[in-house]
Amino acid sequence: MGNNVVVLGTQWGDEGKGKIVDLLTERAKYVVRYQGGHNAGHTLVINGEKTVLHLIPSGILRDNVTSIIGNGVVLSPAALMKEMKGLEDRGIPVRERLLLSEACPLILDYHVALDVAREKARGAKAIGTTGRGIGPAYEDKVARRGLRVGDLFDKATFADKLKEVMEYHNFQLVNFYKADAVDYQKVLDDVMAVADILTGMVVDVSDLLDQARKRGDFVMFEGAQGTLLDIDHGTYPYVTSSNTTAGGVATGSGLGPRYVDYVLGIIKAYSTRVGAGPFPTELFDDIGEFLCKQGNEFGATTGRRRRTGWLDVVAVRRAVQINSLSGFCLTKLDVLDGLKEVKLCIGYRMPDGREVTTTPLAADDWEGIEPIYETMPGWSETTFGVKARSGLPQAALDYIKRIEELTEVPIDIISTGPDRSETMILRDPFDA
């Protein structure tokens, strides 16, 4: 039996993590976010009602679950308050269910201004960030000048620290990026207005998780973005600013790494990517348009159209290695319904003619790569809403089996629609 279960994306994000986390939290006592910020977009559909969460863990909708934002998350007070209000307006008692680490770095207005100014300065070489200040906030953390939730316990000292760091960043904004300075007093007033709310939710997360482990409580760790966007293992520099891999659980929450029992990798039945960066299987034809339309591939956070392509098994195998995956959850299988044939990328042909079965690390090394495909029959029958494996078309079952063979990882959960109920749990991670 696994008490501590990690759910993370195996591709470039947008794999459908939010629904699966919400489904599995039926048995969990705690749900923990351990990296990223409000650049995530987790969509839940429960009894036909759609909820999009960006910062708050997906367990917040359940009254028997405590949601935790760990130290690895960069926290925007403004974004948190907006998200809390939206949920509280629907009668969800967020403040009774949400806890924060005092070590969470804060995202403030100057981080957003820097993010936007830098992307503008990059021009055609823009990374494609969400413009929400995530990268600059992590940068401040590593430079040891960042302000954290815990700093709000001493408001006078916080004000002094804020003034110092804003002088530094405003100098950059005005003199290097030729942008407007950010107003110190407004930033201070805005954060002080919510300081007591934030500090009122602070808890020692590492100790809480250790006590939960000793009691045998079930804990779900909710990843944001995807493995191929990891700051170290992703398609650098077209990556996010945090560790999206399973290793980020320990550093971003304070749980000892030996205590992770099961790692569930969410894998979409095809590939998508938002923003710039390598994407060997990207489709620019009618099939690519079909996948986008059928899969409603528009970002929950930015609204941007996602790039679409065939499932890249080579890239997913890298995710298997890095995360030591225990099992997969396959999502959006129904999007492939109606295609005469489906393809899996099983290797890459390099510019010099070599054939390889592993991914490069640096983005430049992806230049000129051609996907090597294995083609399989498609299926005309619908898989949407199917709730038993026996109800799937044989061609869909063959597709699932081939993914398992190529990755050497079992598919333990199959999602056939956006609602909680449209899911087949073949092996429950908490029972594995």
Curated annotation (Swiss-Prot):
GO biological process, one term: 'de novo' AMP biosynthetic process
Subcellular location: Cytoplasm
GO molecular function, one term: magnesium ion binding
Binding site for GTP: 13-19, 41-43, 306, 332-334, 415-417
UniProt keyword annotations, A-Z: Cytoplasm, GTP-binding, Ligase, Magnesium, Metal-binding, Nucleotide-binding, Purine biosynthesis
Record-annotated active site: D14 (proton acceptor), H42 (proton donor)
Protein family per UniProt: Belongs to the adenylosuccinate synthetase family.
Name of the protein this chain belongs to: Adenylosuccinate synthetase
Species the sequence originates in: Enterobacter sp. (strain 638)
Taxonomic lineage of the native organism: Bacteria, Pseudomonadati, Pseudomonadota, Gammaproteobacteria, Enterobacterales
